[in-house]
């Protein structure tokens, strides 16, 4: 896991510069079952803690998740470490409206801030695309360790695809 955290730190540093906003987009951690609103498993809780540790000191000013337990529980350790509450954006109106609302809120953060967005396998790539990732990584139901880091500022967005926490196994 240490190597993963070092890789994450390198990804954040490679896209961060003065006057630029950084958006970190991840899928929720591993879940206990396949019900409609499951809690995180022990592995998911460990992943949420690893994310918070990796983002400590990154200037996180906004944490966004869906109302579902697994996204909120993944986001909560980072929010708590930054003294923030998790902002919840639901799916009223469907996925396209959700994606647009998340992207709009992320863009409203201060210009030098870091925003954490925790989504789902079907929303993470679309949120990344809405924020300027021309080639977002598709996620399978087994992908929990991927993250997209996007630097928004003058010019085209800078995008880094990275992994964090323990590697997830293939489906």
Residue ranges and their predicted role:
Residues 1-4:
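Positively charged n-region of N-terminal signal peptides that target proteins for export
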Residues 118-120:
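Short beta-strand segments
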Residues 20-110, 124-171:
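Active-site-proximal alpha-helix that buttresses catalytic centers in soluble enzyme cores
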Residues 113-116:
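Acidic/histidine-rich alpha-helical segments that form the ligand environment
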Residues 6-15:
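Bacterial N-terminal signal peptides
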